[in-house]
Amino acid sequence: MASSTLIQNRSCGVTSSMSSFQIFRGQPLRFPGTRTPAAVQCLKKRRCLRPTESVLESSPGSGSYRIVTGPSGINPSSNGHLQEGSLTHRLPIPMEKSIDNFQSTLYVSDIWSETLQRTECLLQVTENVQMNEWIEEIRMYFRNMTLGEISMSPYDTAWVARVPALDGSHGPQFHRSLQWIIDNQLPDGDWGEPSLFLGYDRVCNTLACVIALKTWGVGAQNVERGIQFLQSNIYKMEEDDANHMPIGFEIVFPAMMEDAKALGLDLPYDATILQQISAEREKKMKKIPMAMVYKYPTTLLHSLEGLHREVDWNKLLQLQSENGSFLYSPASTACALMYTKDVKCFDYLNQLLIKFDHACPNVYPVDLFERLWMVDRLQRLGISRYFEREIRDCLQYVYRYWKDCGIGWASNSSVQDVDDTAMAFRLLRTHGFDVKEDCFRQFFKDGEFFCFAGQSSQAVTGMFNLSRASQTLFPGESLLKKARTFSRNFLRTKHENNECFDKWIITKDLAGEVEYNLTFPWYASLPRLEHRTYLDQYGIDDIWIGKSLYKMPAVTNEVFLKLAKADFNMCQALHKKELEQVIKWNASCQFRDLEFARQKSVECYFAGAATMFEPEMVQARLVWARCCVLTTVLDDYFDHGTPVEELRVFVQAVRTWNPELINGLPEQAKILFMGLYKTVNTIAEEAFMAQKRDVHHHLKHYWDKLITSALKEAEWAESGYVPTFDEYMEVAEISVALEPIVCSTLFFAGHRLDEDVLDSYDYHLVMHLVNRVGRILNDIQGMKREASQGKISSVQIYMEEHPSVPSEAMAIAHLQELVDNSMQQLTYEVLRFTAVPKSCKRIHLNMAKIMHAFYKDTDGFSSLTAMTGFVKKVLFEPVPE
């Protein structure tokens, strides 16, 4: 059977077809409408499988699934359908033709013609062995998680090496740490992170190592080379960005210079930069009330080695962490051990040296930090779905240590920071954990938010994560609302001034991350667009700034990036094939012949693919795209000046679902009705297979509501009637045409939706909120176009009802506040547990995000160019390997 014949017989129907790809072990299996293993033999026996058709087949004993193709031949009597009693009902459209081959007969918006013609016919995606290997490698990261994997710090190892023997004998307690220092000197005589040279870091590490070796009279040649390096490079600190100064540098470096002087090291003690650093230390010390140092845990505990001559160590022992450390700093703890010989300090250091082969990181543990940042990276790269169970375990681990006042980078930390707290808050909240806004209260003072309680500074990454967390606010969370405003203003100022660099991390493209957050906040961020953007921003060589530079291999590594790129390209290839089907369907419905209709097949499919990108959501995407196209042409039909009497006949035909009623209507009305009629019937058949029951009446009801509301607006326009704001919104929230798209798609989200769910208050509430958000956003950006068509908008009505409002801008600001309040409520409803499945509520949320993205600055749906770049990124431009 030829493709054209199949399309004709299908009468505007379309089903899902999948390229061959692997469904990886451990991934939730949700393939509504896809052939099940039990159906495969049935299909083969009846010779109903086409060479290009995809079926779901399991690998015996492996627990994995893959998509395979069928043999040649089709039962001619089936006319494109399976015989009665089979498990599926309709063959997918074959994929022999590329876009190039059918471009001459299928029509899309002119803006996409050139792009579609340039698109190459990609090879079918096959079982990707490499992807399986990368997934397993990442799973090993999860399995091996303990208290965190982190690179070594010469600085901290040097302080540990300085600890004298605890039995009173002459010599070091940890002599193998001295050997590690000798073995890890770099070729130019310094110590530090080999992949990046920063003056502050190299000088600080080198000075600490030279002092340790000189203290015990070992490694004379290493000491000499280290001193030569210091003599030549101390001045280079003047050229360094102050943001790259190690943690506590102004406190610890002058103290080490005093130690070096006492050892007789030949260094330029009078250098201007050293005098400046010493002056900064004095300034900071004057601000530190020593009585408070002994009373409350502060970040100063992390740098006690810089105060070892000033503090009372016995008093400080009361602030020791449970694991024996001082705020998880090996250097600070080693210094405490020198003065107190405390057994808990010794145990902490000894365990570190065993784990890390006689060296130390700059901080340990980092268990919460590692888990949170790893989950965040996997999500932003778009590959978190492969690790749902592992991610859940990670977040449960974090929640175990969650406190009302927030968290730090390590479990049971006595000091919390806004960066880790914000990251945890956002991830926990969006995964359904109960977290409250009060966790940010200690970081808020005098209208500003800070990194640590009691401090007066901000970091770009800390405010970046605070901004992301604050965007998930619920109704009534005033502190989070303040955090959202403050962090957004802070980030905007930094970005405008080209100051997007950070004191905690040196990353590939922090400015780009900030720009995306400002342009597409959570309400407007389409998942696949975020993934594609972050693929360019993710740095496999990102380096954090602690007391020395360090790396987190479970957070930034090449395997994440390889899997993310392969996954994006795999999904994109599938999406291109599906887009071909949507364009074919649009042509078979003859919608191109409708003079009044915008051609938006590509944009409609993009909206679905950018939010429901997973391969198993294929049928949901195709239903979404078809319904979106239908709402577009219906909207144009009702808006282009069609006589109201004709509209009433059209509405009656839809209401009764009777094609005979359109016999007297113009040809274009007939084309539109039959396209709607046949497509909804086809979707009803597909939904029957997905839901195992008839939902046709629900589907017809969605379209009946839509065209009834559109007719009401047409009658208002004809009569010149201006409704009240509430009266308008009651009708316009339906006429914005989101409900048929969303609610039809829900039947293909992987869950059975019974009548109790569809009739529930929760179900109708989330749809109402989405409708309200969509209508107001559409009105704000489209009011001029609507006015030219004789239609009224919420902006116009609001101004007429509130004559005291001095300007259109103020009216819009009020309406945007309504949108914001609705989004807060929608966020709450989506993230809390209700009878409506979470995957279904996610589709509601995604529609609200789509409306924000499309109507952010302009009417992006009607515009020919506003969304072009984003569409190309998601659908047409593969990620370079």
Curated annotation (Swiss-Prot):
Cofactor-binding details, from the entry: Binds 4 Mg(2+) ions per subunit.
SUPFAM superfamilies in alphabetical order: Terpenoid cyclases/Protein prenyltransferases (SSF48239), Terpenoid synthases (SSF48576)
Organism the protein comes from: Physcomitrium patens (Spreading-leaved earth moss)
InterPro entries: Isoprenoid_synthase_dom_sf, Terpene_cyclase-like_1_C, Terpene_cyclase_plant_C1, Terpene_synth_N, Terpene_synth_N_sf, Terpene_synthase-like, Terpene_synthase_metal-bd, Terpenoid_cyclase/PrenylTrfase
GO MF annotation, one: terpene synthase activity
Comment field on protein domains: The Asp-Asp-Xaa-Xaa-Asp/Glu (DDXXD/E) motif is important for the ent-kaurene synthase (KS) catalytic activity, presumably through binding to Mg(2+). The Asp-Xaa-Asp-Asp-Thr-Ala (DXDDTA) motif is important for the ent-copalyl diphosphate synthase (CPS) catalytic activity, presumably through binding to Mg(2+).
GO cellular component, one term: chloroplast
Protein name as annotated: Ent-kaurene synthase CPS/KS, chloroplastic
Catalytic activity line of the entry: (2E,6E,10E)-geranylgeranyl diphosphate = ent-copalyl diphosphate; ent-copalyl diphosphate = ent-kaur-16-ene + diphosphate; ent-copalyl diphosphate = ent-beyerene + diphosphate; ent-copalyl diphosphate = ent-sandaracopimara-8(14),15-diene + diphosphate
Pfam families assigned to the protein according to its UniProt record, in alphabetical order: Terpene_synth, Terpene_synth_C
Family: Belongs to the terpene synthase family.
Positions of Mg(2+) 3 binding: 635, 639
Main localization of the protein described in the UniProt heading: plastid
Positions with a binding annotation for Mg(2+) 1: 417, 419
Inactivation phenotype: Lost ability to convert geranylgeranyl diphosphate (GGPP) into diterpenoids.
Residues noted as binding Mg(2+) 4 in the record, renumbered to the chain: 778-779, 786
Cofactor: Mg(2+)
